[in-house]
Regions:
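C-terminal functional module detector
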Residues: 2-26, 38, 44-48, 236-245, ...
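Short, Lys/Arg-enriched charge-dense amphipathic segments
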Residues: 66-69, 84-89, 147-151, 180, ...
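A metal-dependent hydrolase metal-coordination microenvironment
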Residues: 7-185, 217-229, 249-252, 374-383
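Short, solvent-exposed coil/turn segments at beta-strand boundaries
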Residues: 118, 141-146, 207-208, 283, ...
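Long, contiguous interaction/targeting segments characteristic
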Residues: 150-155, 159-168, 174-290
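Short loop/turn motifs at secondary-structure junctions
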Residues: 55, 207-208, 365, 379
Length: 431
């Protein structure tokens, strides 16, 4: 390439590149689900059976303030959710024989709709922390203990649960962050320097917090999650210490919400240990049937979702090649902007090659791809692109964010009374 620009490309899929090309190594996954043990409309049995019928491979119940167990064991009963006795009926879990059949793929539901031979993997020891915060500063913990169980949580405090989960030996991700930022009122909140600095600080200090949700359910209050994700990548990657993985979960509270967002994990074998490794290393794709900024306000994905069938990085020539099915368009994104778009006439197979050198003026430190089709959207994790001088893209520190550290800076605004005043009562006095 002579004097042309050379990039060192960090490929999160390098360890599974060959596995991507085999259907057997793709695992349809949801790691954020609820039941009547917390605040959902459907029982655990109803949720499990629907996930099973919809050919999911891996499922975690991350209930509000309740640590998940194997599905044939009764989860803890938290007094906050006793209203379910009057509201949505009895709680219900499966028995040991049913659990075994679900895991080995021999379980029969009323619909009997499952097409896969393998079973549905249970992911225990998951929890959604800060179970009663009105502003929804929620954190999901995995492979953790009961340190966050039954804890209401402090408004605006992400750090306490992240720290507890890390101390337990677990990992975490931040849930629907721009819902907390009230993006439904101000979509540009994801670009406010103080907001970016707030989350960047958490990711710097807690490596066990492996990422954030970028796709969640119907993509209504959290539609700016991808904007925030790109802003964080621009800040953190040039520092040379970490990236942020983008997760997709349905956050289902009803069976009708189950197939709205999920992930395609690429695993060498079907095991919890491999799942954790994949969560830490970013060897998965995030998928959704709703993505308002990318697909349109009224778009609803129908049918087969886009899938990646091959992904190769050629560092010598500075290219990344992605092959997909069930899609019409592949877009490459850098710094939150689309820098290349490749299309075919109708949904089907597509191959897209990006030359980093050709787009060097628009690439700071990463690129990521998204595949669009009638079924929805698929997003890859970011590929770090280092031209040898990443440090020049490291920005000056933004205004110091207000971060709760052990409660020293806990103010009235961080109480439930303060939230009610600031978000519900105070605005009514404004003209």
């Amino acid at each position: 390439m002579g004097d042309s620009m050379k990039y060192k490309i960090s490929n999160p899929y390098a360890s599974v590149a060959d596995l991507i090309e085999s259907k057997d190594n793709h695992y349809k996954t949801n790691l954020h689900t609820h039941s009547t043990y917390s605040d959902a409309n459907n029982t655990m049995v109803e949720m499990i059976e629907e996930f099973y019928d919809q050919d999911f491979d891996i499922l975690a119940f991350a209930e509000h303030g309740i640590l998940g167990k194997e599905w044939d064991k009764e989860p803890s009963i938290i007094p906050l959710f006793l209203f379910q006795n009057l509201w949505h009926g009895k709680r219900k879990h499966i028995n040991s024989a049913e659990f075994k059949a679900i895991q080995n793929g021999t379980y029969k539901t009323f619909k009997n709709a499952r097409k896969k031979d393998r079973g549905l993997m249970c992911v225990p020891d998951a929890i959604e922390a800060n179970m009663f915060t009105l502003v929804k500063n929620h954190v999901n913990g995995y492979f953790t203990d009961d340190a966050c169980e039954g804890i209401f949580g402090r408004e605006n405090d992400y750090e306490t649960p992240i720290r507890k989960i890390e101390n337990s030996g677990g990992i975490s991700h931040i849930n629907h962050p721009t819902d907390w930022l009230e993006a439904y009122n101000d979509p540009d909140c994801a670009k406010v320097p103080e907001n970016i600095a707030f989350f960047a600080d958490l990711f710097r200090r807690y490596r066990s917090c492996v990422g954030m949700e970028v796709l969640n359910m119907f993509d209504r209050p959290n539609r700016s999650d991808r904007i925030l994700w790109d802003e964080l990548l621009k800040v953190l990657i040039p520092e040379g210490k970490r990236t942020v993985w983008g997760f997709a979960n349905s956050d289902a509270h009803r069976v009708t919400e189950i197939d709205t967002a999920f992930m395609d994990f690429i695993l060498p074998e079907f095991s919890l240990a491999n799942l954790r490794t994949a969560m830490e290393n970013g060897t998965f794709f995030s998928i959704a049937r709703y993505a308002k900024n990318e697909l349109g306000e009224d778009f609803v994905g129908q049918g087969e979702v886009p899938a990646v069938t091959s992904l190769r990085v050629d560092e010598e020539n500075g290219t990344i090649t992605i092959k997909g099915i069930n899609c019409k368009t592949v877009e490459w994104i850098a710094d939150g902007e689309i820098i290349q778009s490749d299309c075919v006439a109708t949904d089907g197979e597509i191959t897209s090659v990006i030359s980093l050198e050709e787009h060097s003026e628009r690439i700071s430190c990463y690129v990521r791809a998204q595949l669009k089709g009638k079924g929805g959207i698929l997003m890859t994790q970011p590929f770090t692109c280092d031209d040898g001088d990443l440090a020049r893209f490291a920005g000056k520190p933004a205004a110091d964010p207000r971060i709760l550290k052990g409660g020293e800076e806990y103010t009235f605004a961080d109480t439930r009374a303060g939230v009610i005043w600031n978000r519900s009562i105070k605005p009514k006095f404004k003209k």
